[in-house]
């Protein structure tokens, strides 16, 4: 039987296309505490700023006294707020969890059509508005390929179109070589909460092949 593995974890490491999205220094006694706090931080950011279309959150925790949070999003104005008021509120919430000095960097995503999280979130939001899943999926694939993706695959599962029997529909364009480790493939998952149930959205985006000389330059 074939075994499935998360394509992001499969390609994460010092000599692989992806780096870790959370970097911290901990021992076996306090590692679980650090991990729980990081999960709380990610949940707060994704919940309070769900309309900012966040694509990635990088957390650097070099010591117990300092923590740096880098947020990549399409709509950075939603996170910053008026006169930076929302940023200060977010800093206070994170400081309560970590008891450390918090630094937050907001980065705007220039090509969101290539970001797997943005694609999955956009499809989920459109499905919640009862748009046709076929049109939504094809539109997302076309936009991603137009921006330079080498391949993309999208799967939607659930009661598509409100039918009684749940099923899965998939669309693919280009190549998505999941067995090639040097292939920079990004994966994301999102859920659409509809009146007739939850629809799961899975997205794979194949950006490029990473050569050994460039492998450390790719995030």
Curated annotation (Swiss-Prot):
GO terms for biological process: translation. Residues 41-110 form the KH type-2 domain. Signal peptide: none annotated. Keywords: Ribonucleoprotein, Ribosomal protein, RNA-binding, rRNA-binding. The keyword rRNA-binding applies. One of its GO terms (cellular component) is cytosolic small ribosomal subunit. Gene3D superfamilies: 3.30.300.20, Ribosomal protein S3, C-terminal domain. One of its GO terms (molecular function) is rRNA binding. The keyword Ribosomal protein applies. InterPro entries: KH_dom-like_a/b (IPR015946), KH_dom_type_2 (IPR004044), KH_sf_prok-type (IPR009019), Ribosomal_S3_C_sf (IPR036419), Ribosomal_uS3_bac-typ (IPR005704), Ribosomal_uS3_C (IPR001351). Belongs to the universal ribosomal protein uS3 family. Part of the 30S ribosomal subunit. Forms a tight complex with proteins S10 and S14. Binds the lower part of the 30S subunit head. Binds mRNA in the 70S ribosome, positioning it for translation. This is Small ribosomal subunit protein uS3. The lineage of its organism: Bacteria, Pseudomonadati, Pseudomonadota, Alphaproteobacteria, Rickettsiales. The gene is rpsC.
